[in-house]
């Protein structure tokens, strides 16, 4: 009888320890996921929206529906005759075509 009782206590202790480890793993995974989401949200807040100037930060454009916007630059001649480069975040033509095809496919195939 003592052996069965001792074995039962040992079994309950091991089960308790393993379930505590499992819950710790779940908590750690939740914390990691939450930190990842917070980092993504901060990066999203720091990004440059579509049609806004990106002359000083050419890699900081936000994401669109499918693709990240690209910094597109043009040379502008000012009234004083100086040429300056002006850049804005936009969707390149090949990305627009891909989004059009995907949108069309979604309408057809539901």
From Swiss-Prot:
GO terms for cellular component: extracellular region. PROSITE patterns: SPIDER_CSTX. Disulfide bonds join 47-62, 54-71, 61-89, 73-87. Keywords: Disulfide bond, Knottin, Secreted, Signal, Toxin. It is found in: Secreted. Expressed by the venom gland. It holds the Pfam family Toxin_35. One of its GO terms (molecular function) is toxin activity. The presence of a 'disulfide through disulfide knot' structurally defines this protein as a knottin. Belongs to the neurotoxin 19 (CSTX) family. 03 subfamily. Residues 1-20 form the signal peptide. It comes from the Eukaryota. InterPro entries: Spider_toxin_CSTX_knottin, Spider_toxin_CSTX_Knottin_CS. Residues 21-44 form a propeptide. This is U1-lycotoxin-Ls1kk.
């Amino acid at each position: 009888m003592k052996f069965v009782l001792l074995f039962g206590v040992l079994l309950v202790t091991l089960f308790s320890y393993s379930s505590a480890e499992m819950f710790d793993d779940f908590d750690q995974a939740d914390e990691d996921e939450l930190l990842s989401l917070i980092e993504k949200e901060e990066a999203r807040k720091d990004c440059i929206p579509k049609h806004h100037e990106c002359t000083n930060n050419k890699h900081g454009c936000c994401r669109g529906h499918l693709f990240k916007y690209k910094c597109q630059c043009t040379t502008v001649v000012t009234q004083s005759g100086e040429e300056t480069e002006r850049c804005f975040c936009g969707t390149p033509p090949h990305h627009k075509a891909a989004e059009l095809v995907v949108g069309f496919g979604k309408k057809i195939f539901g």
